[in-house]
Amino acid sequence: MGLSDGEWQLVLNVWGKVEADLAGHGQEVLIRLFKGHPETLEKFDKFKHLKSEDEMKGSEDLKKHGNTVLTALGGILKKKGKHEAELKPLAQSHATKHKIPIKYLEFISEAIIQVLQSKHPGDFGADAQGAMKRALELFRNDIAAKYKELGFQG
């Protein structure tokens, strides 16, 4: 089920704060992901060697990838659920090339919520958190459907 116009507005309001520093937010999201779920680091050849949080914070490649991830996610969120065109190539690459399980998308969704809670507590109250969780769940469900079409059991 989709989000209401009001819920999308809550999502996009806080996303405006994220866009002020995509690379910084993205880096923090990836660090939380890798610290909370170290197994996810194995999917990233560029980052496998980063063992400590300090090493991760010092990595320009990690910062760049964080920017890439959140730029793509922002483009999807702005479509308010009508994200078929944006989702298809993302699902294709994540299923066939990177082989990223849906579970890992759940993990990064959790990390996104945590980063938004810590960086924007005034703009990310219970209603906004609920809306963002639903938006990310919609994204994951749609990616999972694409994975299935592609024959990937992620």
Swiss-Prot record:
A Gene Ontology cellular-component term? sarcoplasm
Give the residues the record marks as binding O2. Answer: 65
Cite the Globin domain residue spans from the record: 2-148
Which residues are nitrite-binding? Answer: 65
Gene3D superfamilies annotated for this entry? Answer: 6.10.140.2100, 6.10.140.2110
What protein family is recorded? Belongs to the globin family.
UniProt name for this protein? Myoglobin
Q: Which organism is the protein's source? A: Lutra lutra (European river otter)
Which gene is this protein's source?
MB
